[in-house]
């Protein structure tokens, strides 16, 4: 008990053997019902493959032919028959209207020239009752991100994301900061969610 008493108040910041966000994610995914998920701006598809472990189907969208080729190859090597990579733009994803349960933008929306258009497309491809999840950087002033990471936008404020979701017609939009980096430039990650009515 002394060991845990000393850890009180810093448990989340201290190394604990076997405790990782990746392990927690695997556990939480097992609680999800089988769904059709669109992973927008999927890149190599690390997250897509994690989701494919429990999803009914994952559609990974990226505008880089090399990323799509690589992701598809790795998915095949790992036996993910329910994971499909498609070459396309997150503003006009090659996905049928009303066909997915969840649209996920994980650190992808800041790469869109027209982020509002990407959110509108997410609404279009979602089934009624489907959800949008946006994980992105909160507004920041680190201009080098444009050159270093090909960011088009320097993150988004909670107000901006809430307004984007509301404008399209998402119900119950919620926005919150979910992570803060300790080292400079101290990026914060913001989560925005909404539900398509119907």
Model segments located where?
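Class I S-adenosylmethionine-dependent transferase superfamily signal
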Residues: 28, 51, 122
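Class I SAM-dependent methyltransferase SAM/SAH-binding core
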Residues: 38, 44-92
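A short acidic, Gly/Pro-enriched loop at the edge of an enzyme's catalytic core
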Residues: 91-103
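Amphipathic alpha-helical dimerization/coiled-coil segments
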Residues: 1-9
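A short glycine-rich, Lys/Arg-flanked "PGG" loop and its adjoining helix->strand segment in the class I
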Residues: 116-131
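C-terminal alpha-helical "lid/dimerization" subdomain adjacent to the S-adenosyl-L-methionine
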Residues: 131-193
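A short SAM/SAH-binding and catalytic strip from SAM-dependent methyltransferases
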Residues: 101-114
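Conserved alpha-helix/loop element of class I SAM-dependent methyltransferases that forms part
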Residues: 17-36
């Amino acid at each position: 008990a002394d060991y845990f008493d000393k850890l009180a108040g810093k448990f989340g910041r201290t190394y604990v053997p076997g405790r990782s966000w990746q392990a927690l994610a695997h556990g939480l995914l097992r609680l999800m019902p089988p769904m059709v998920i669109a992973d927008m701006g999927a890149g190599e598809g690390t997250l897509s493959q994690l989701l494919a472990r429990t999803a009914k189907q994952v559609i990974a969208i990226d505008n880089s032919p090399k990323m799509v080729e690589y992701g598809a190859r790795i998915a095949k090597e790992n036996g993910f028959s329910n994971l499909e990579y498609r070459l396309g733009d997150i503003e006009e994803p090659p996905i049928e209207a009303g066909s997915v349960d969840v649209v996920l933008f994980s650190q992808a929306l800041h790469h869109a020239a027209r982020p509002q258009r990407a959110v509108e497309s997410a609404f279009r491809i979602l089934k009624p009752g489907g959800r949008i999840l946006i994980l992105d950087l909160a507004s920041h002033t680190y201009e080098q991100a444009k050159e270093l990471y090909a960011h088009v936008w320097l993150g988004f404020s909670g107000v901006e994301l809430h307004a984007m979701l509301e404008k399209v017609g998402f119900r119950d939009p919620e926005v919150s900061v979910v992570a803060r980096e300790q080292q400079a430039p101290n990026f914060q990650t913001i989560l925005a969610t909404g539900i398509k009515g119907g």
